[in-house]
């Protein structure tokens, strides 16, 4: 049995499931999402993604949570270790100081053993 690609998805992927103003991104995202629904990928979602979704306005927020409910995913939470790694990414110049959220996503994906981050 072939190992599934383990992907960490960021908020923008879920958001682009309903993006009529960006039909190209929406079409690409829908194709990817279909693979997630059929189990082609092992999907990982970080707690920062959930927090970002909570900040969205209705009806978009409900739509995105409903979409997440249609795929299997592993939820990973921010830990002291992920904070430390995110700080190192920024401290070493891998990301700008204002890139704290991106660093958090990357650190979580790293600790979760993801093969790719999809954004």
Question: Which residue stretches match the model-derived regions?
Answer:
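Short, well-structured N-terminal submotif of metal-dependent ribonuclease cores
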Residues: 1-45, 54-65, 91-92, 96
């Amino acid at each position: 049995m072939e190992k599934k690609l383990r992907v960490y998805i960021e908020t923008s992927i879920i958001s682009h499931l309903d993006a009529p103003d960006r039909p190209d991104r929406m079409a690409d995202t829908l194709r990817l999402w279909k693979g997630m629904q059929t189990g082609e990928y092992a999907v990982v979602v970080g707690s920062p993604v959930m927090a970002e979704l909570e900040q969205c306005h209705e009806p978009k927020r409900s739509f995105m949570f409903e979409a997440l409910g249609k795929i299997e995913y592993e939820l990973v939470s921010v830990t002291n270790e992920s904070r430390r790694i995110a700080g190192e990414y920024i401290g070493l110049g891998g990301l700008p100081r204002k890139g704290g959220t991106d660093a958090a996503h990357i650190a979580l994906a790293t600790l979760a053993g993801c093969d790719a981050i999809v954004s």
